Curated annotation (Swiss-Prot):
Belongs to the MnmG family. TrmFO subfamily. Catalyzes the folate-dependent formation of 5-methyl-uridine at position 54 (M-5-U54) in all tRNAs. It comes from the Bacteria. Its cofactor is FAD. Its EC number is 2.1.1.74. It is an enzyme of class 2 (transferase). Coiled coil: none annotated. GO terms for molecular function: flavin adenine dinucleotide binding; tRNA (uracil(54)-C5)-methyltransferase activity, 5,10-methylenetetrahydrofolate-dependent. FAD binds at residues 8-13. This is Methylenetetrahydrofolate--tRNA-(uracil-5-)-methyltransferase TrmFO. It catalyses: uridine(54) in tRNA + (6R)-5,10-methylene-5,6,7,8-tetrahydrofolate + NADH + H(+) = 5-methyluridine(54) in tRNA + (6S)-5,6,7,8-tetrahydrofolate + NAD(+); uridine(54) in tRNA + (6R)-5,10-methylene-5,6,7,8-tetrahydrofolate + NADPH + H(+) = 5-methyluridine(54) in tRNA + (6S)-5,6,7,8-tetrahydrofolate + NADP(+). One of its GO terms (biological process) is tRNA wobble uridine modification.
């Protein structure tokens, strides 16, 4: 029988392999470790966790919890193993990292349908169904090949992501809508600062705690995109002549330009999420929460995701992927994991589940599935396959802001999240039933 080839044995690749093997489809997982090593991997196990050992919340009223519940309904291997290897962490799902990866590998190797081949793949196979899940540390040779297959401008080698804020946590009495010099639509929200507010803000940025790099030599990737806290250290006025410049923005309350301004740009059509323009940062998450809440209008800001800057190979997926996670130019090829622009362990694994299910359905000549954007997995896929200007595309994690809003707005956040979760699971179960996905 022809075998499906999976390039990369990380979280996404392991989930994809499981979905294929349980449907009795032969799989070859190509994993370059330990033949070719990376700066952060410590073992040769599949699904190795290189950073945190936490998979975040299990509560259904949390976006991460909903994502995991959807994955559970799609028979996630990683969640099953996570429960087996769980360590105490309150409502979060944390694991013994070595036991977790070891057990995932054991289960996959126990399957008569799975073969693991320890070698580096440098080019896409020209025949057969292929799932590419090489992750944030894609080898240089394969990355170079991807640049030829995609195009040079669509492959990125680091994240420089500004924080994203839930729209309903912004104090609209303190911000104003305007575009610079009144040109174009007033799509930006502007948070004005006085001289005193600005100088206190800069002082806190200068003294804030930052994240240490996981990857040797990582800093060289950021020379063309400096963190906000590094800019602050270059001089008291650097930020207000850079990303916080007020030029051409008139505060309607004063009729004048503010001393400095923080701009917020809508992240989606529904305007449920706003990103902080030019605020790429390496501040620790608790520092981002503390310092960015000093900004007028953001005193009670809730963060859909925090700013990050780290090594991460990913590409501009909307140009190349269908909602089935197939490559538009060659539909026998699927892409999954962080490579397509999702951020996080479970988010990457969820993409592997969908790629695995659809690869299996393609193999058997069945119609492929597209999960609705009312589900968290479907919303993530919608995010990475919906075209936006390239300069605005950045990796995304599970959060409530990417889901389609409810038909009727609800102010109570807990109630709204519960109703969103109930709708997501109901819609997912409908797809599972209609397509007989778990059969």
């Amino acid at each position: 029988m022809e075998k499906v080839k999976i390039i990369g044995g990380g979280l996404a690749g392991s989930e994809a392999a499981w979905q294929l093997a349980k449907r009795k489809i032969p799989v070859e997982i190509y994993e370059m470790r330990p033949i070719v090593t990376t700066p952060v991997h410590k073992t040769e196990y599949l699904a190795e966790l290189v950073c945190s050992n936490s998979f975040k919340s299990t509560e259904i009223t949390n976006a991460s919890g909903l994502l995991k519940e959807e994955m559970r309904k799609l028979d996630s291997l990683l969640l099953r193993v996570a429960e087996e290897t769980r360590v105490p962490a309150g409502v979060a799902l944390a694991v013994d990292r070595e036991l977790f990866s070891k057990r995932v590998q054991e289960i996959l190797l126990e399957s008569p349908y799975v073969t693991v081949i320890r070698e580096e793949v440098k080019k896409l196979p020209k025949e057969g169904i292929v799932i590419v899940a090489t992750g944030p540390l894609t080898s240089s040779d394969f990355a170079e090949h991807l640049m030829e297959v995609l195009d040079t401008d669509s492959l990125y080698f680091y994240d420089a992501v500004s924080p994203i804020i839930y729209a309903d946590s912004i104090n609209y009495e303190k911000v104003f809508s305007a575009s610079r010099y009144g040109k174009g639509e007033e799509t930006y929200l502007n948070c004005p600062m006085t001289k005193e507010e600005y100088e206190r803000f800069v002082e806190e940025l200068i003294n804030a705690e930052t994240v240490e790099s996981h990857y040797p030599g990582e800093e060289k990737f950021f020379e063309g995109c400096l963190p906000i806290e590094v800019l602050a250290k270059r001089g008291i006025d650097t930020l207000r002549y850079g990303p916080m410049k007020p030029i051409g923005l008139i505060d309607p309350k004063t009729g004048k330009e503010p001393y400095a301004v923080v701009q917020l740009r809508p992240e989606n059509i529904q305007k449920t999420l706003y990103s902080m323009v030019g605020f790429q940062t390496r501040l620790k998450f608790q520092e981002q929460r503390r310092i960015f809440r000093m900004i007028p209008g953001l005193e009670n800001a809730e963060f859909a995701r925090y700013g990050v800057m780290h090594r991460n190979t990913y590409f501009y997926a909307p140009k190349f992927l269908k909602a089935t996670l197939q490559f538009i130019k060659d539909e026998r090829v699927f892409f999954a994991g962080q490579l397509i622009g999702v951020e996080g362990y479970m988010e990457s694994a969820a993409m592997g589940i969908v790629a695995g299910i659809n690869a299996a359905r393609l193999y058997k000549g069945k119609p492929l599935i597209i999960l609705p954007p009312t589900t968290m997995i479907g919303a993530l896929i919608s995010y990475v396959t919906t075209k936006v200007p390239v300069r605005y595309y950045q990796p995304m994690n599970a959060n409530w802001g990417i889901l389609l809003p409810l038909d009727k707005p609800i102010k109570d956040k807990k109630l709204r999240n519960r109703l969103l979760a109930e709708r997501a699971l109901r819609d997912l179960e409908d797809v599972i039933r209609r397509f007989a996905i778990n059969v």
